[in-house]
């Protein structure tokens, strides 16, 4: 289990981002999987079982990845957090606008800094053995597979 200090550091660095004011929408089209070559270890919505007891559903997705390969920005945005946290390791949070943010945990190395603008597919760091990714609209987790397939309510047809 994580230490109280690690949990406090995570809460102070990340939780405020859940309710941060929304900037204008910076992305268009579908998002890309940050780990091009990966295998799902824990899927979004999967029920957690500990010691035979059913627990909560996973809000994030954990992927088995190839260490050293690039971790890609899922969509255009601004890096609002890029640092090592005791609880989640090297962590990158990208604000894509309209309240949509991607949270990437467990990177081997960081390649971006806070305040930096990134484009979809740009390397934001190097992958470790596992990547935990969480996509949130405000404080509500979003199924990443729908983002990658451009389906669902986030992909409305804009008036032209």
Show which residues each predicted segment covers.
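Conserved, short, structured surface segments that act as functional micro-motifs
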Residues: 92-93, 116-160
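Zn2+-dependent peptidoglycan hydrolase active-site motif and core
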Residues: 73-108, 130-133
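Short histidine-centered loop motifs in beta-beta connectors
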Residues: 98-121, 149
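Surface-exposed, glycine-biased beta-strand/turn segments
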Residues: 1-88
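Short, well-structured beta-strand-loop connectors
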Residues: 70-80, 112-127
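Solvent-exposed coil/turn segments that connect beta secondary-structure elements
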Residues: 45, 68, 84, 97-99, ...
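Glycine-centered loop/turn positions within well-structured domains
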Residues: 61, 69, 102, 110, ...
């Amino acid at each position: 289990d994580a230490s109280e200090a690690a949990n406090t550091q995570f809460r102070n660095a990340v939780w405020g981002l859940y309710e941060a004011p929304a900037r204008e929408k910076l992305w268009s089209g579908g998002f890309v999987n940050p780990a091009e070559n990966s295998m799902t270890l824990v899927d979004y919505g999967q029920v957690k079982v500990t010691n035979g007891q059913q627990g909560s559903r996973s809000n994030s997705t954990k992927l088995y990845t190839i260490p050293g390969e690039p971790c890609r920005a899922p969509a255009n945005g601004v890096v609002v957090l890029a640092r090592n946290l005791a609880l989640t390791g090297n962590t990158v949070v990208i604000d894509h606008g309209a309240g949509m943010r991607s949270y990437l945990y467990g990177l081997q190395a960081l390649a971006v800094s806070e305040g930096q603008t990134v484009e979809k597919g740009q390397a934001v760091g190097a992958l470790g053995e596992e990547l935990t990714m969480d996509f949130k609209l405000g404080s509500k987790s979003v199924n990443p597979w729908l983002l990658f397939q451009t389906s669902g309510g986030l992909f409305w047809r804009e008036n032209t």
